[in-house]
Amino acid sequence: MCHSRSCHPTMTILQAPTPAPSTIPGPRRGSGPEIFTFDPLPEPAAAPAGRPSASRGHRKRSRRVLYPRVVRRQLPVEEPNPAKRLLFLLLTIVFCQILMAEEGVPAPLPPEDAPNAASLAPTPVSAVLEPFNLTSEPSDYALDLSTFLQQHPAAF
């Protein structure tokens, strides 16, 4: 009894050709010679000349599908996009500028032979930036950080 892909059991019966009843009593042996020779065996003339599958009937083909081995499929290579590269470069430059920006450092002055007393005085804060200043006095955190950096210059 064989099981097909469905859950219902099926019976497969192979019909073997039945030999014609013999008139010689006793066990029947093969029709070949008793001693092995290289001579070809004579073909029986009684066999009908037809298709060999016609005598067996219609035999079902096996439904096993042979899939190829599992192969890792590779995606096609993307073409380089110059717009993406430029955007990445721009974002990298902006990120580096933000990362390395120093707050509270005055802009570098042009080099002069003799410094004036007016150039040593702190530059006044522009009126445009003043509304954005939300604290009236400098924070203690900024002072603590500057003193720490003066005491430990190799920390950063």
From Swiss-Prot:
Transmembrane segments: 83-99
Localization per record: Membrane
Region of interest: Disordered: 1-62
PTM comment text: Phosphorylated at Thr-18, Thr-123 and Ser-126 by MAPK1/ERK2 and probably MAPK3/ERK1. Upon phosphorylation by MAPK1/ERK2 and MAPK3/ERK1, acquires the ability to inhibit cell death induced by various stimuli. Glycosylated.
Residues recorded with modification Phosphoserine: S31, S126
Modified residues (Phosphothreonine): T18, T123
Cytoplasmic topological domain: 1-82
InterPro entries: IEX-1 (IPR024829)
Induction trigger: By radiation, 12-O-tetradecanoyl phorbol-13 acetate (TPA), okadaic acid, TNF and NUPR1.
Cellular component GO terms, alphabetical: cytosol; membrane; mitochondrion; nucleus
Residues with attached carbohydrate: N133
Keywords: Glycoprotein, Membrane, Phosphoprotein, Signal-anchor, Transmembrane, Transmembrane helix
Low complexity composition bias: residue spans: 44-55
Membrane topology of this protein: Single-pass type II membrane protein
Primary residence: membrane
Extracellular topological domain residue ranges: 100-156
Subunit structure: Interacts with the PPP2R5C-PP2A holoenzyme and ERK kinases; regulates ERK dephosphorylation.
Function: May play a role in the ERK signaling pathway by inhibiting the dephosphorylation of ERK by phosphatase PP2A-PPP2R5C holoenzyme. Also acts as an ERK downstream effector mediating survival. As a member of the NUPR1/RELB/IER3 survival pathway, may provide pancreatic ductal adenocarcinoma with remarkable resistance to cell stress, such as starvation or gemcitabine treatment.
Similarity section: Belongs to the IER3 family.
Annotated protein name in UniProt: Radiation-inducible immediate-early gene IEX-1
